[in-house]
Amino acid sequence: NTLVYDYDQPASFWGGNEYLNFDTKDMRAATAAIQEVRLEDIYEHYLYPNTPRNNKPYTYFPDVNGDFIPRTLQGALPEREGDYTWVHFSLKPNGKGNSETYIYVLGKFNNYTPSPEYLMTYNATQKMYQARILFKQGFYNYSYALSPVLYETGFSDTSLENETYLDENGIDGNFHFTENQYQILVYFKGFLDQHQRLVGIGSANSMNINDQ
């Protein structure tokens, strides 16, 4: 007997784009993505304004697939000795900003969960969406996600269908060149089983996956 798996089209999903990043390992210095550093009550890091990438050609931009790495030059143990800093994000839309479109900053640092502290607000004077978010020192990947609805308590909002409303590619775009790390979980449910069973687990990188 032969078991044929032919579920390619329904199981397909968008490839996304490489993540954006910033690095605050040195609190007093502006790295490649940081435009300005200020010292108020604590350090404030202002990132260079971003623009949507969904209408631009793909550019290879090495990332850590949405992850983050705590690190500091001011101590040997970043998990304990790293400080906190306010990071300022700004996104310049292609057209006129829309106060009824909600944009969130997402990454593994917040488990990709939209909630009020990661919501951007539109600054009509500067014509940009802006957000001010508290981070521990380190290297972070992040991306922008669009939503037509406002998440007041993250995915715990019972009135919303969770991530169904999130468009994670509307700003950053989709490219088949994008390098991604995937984790595969295989479940099985027998005829007499009441629950599905996890029977296999694996991981693969899009750079070395083939159809064999």
Model-derived regions, located:
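Aromatic-rich carbohydrate-binding modules that target alpha-glucans
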Residues: 1, 86-137, 149-183, 189
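Long, internal scaffold/assembly segments composed of regular secondary structure
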Residues: 1-59
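Sparse, context-dependent recognition of short Cys/His-centered cofactor- or disulfide-binding micro-motifs
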Residues: 7, 72-76, 118, 129
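A general structural signal for short secondary-structure junctions and capping/turn motifs
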Residues: 10-13, 79, 133-134
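Active-site-adjacent segment of 2-oxoglutarate/Fe(II) JmjC oxygenases
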Residues: 13-18, 169-207
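Basic K/R-rich, polyanion-interacting modules in nucleoproteins and related proteins
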Residues: 44-99, 185, 198-212
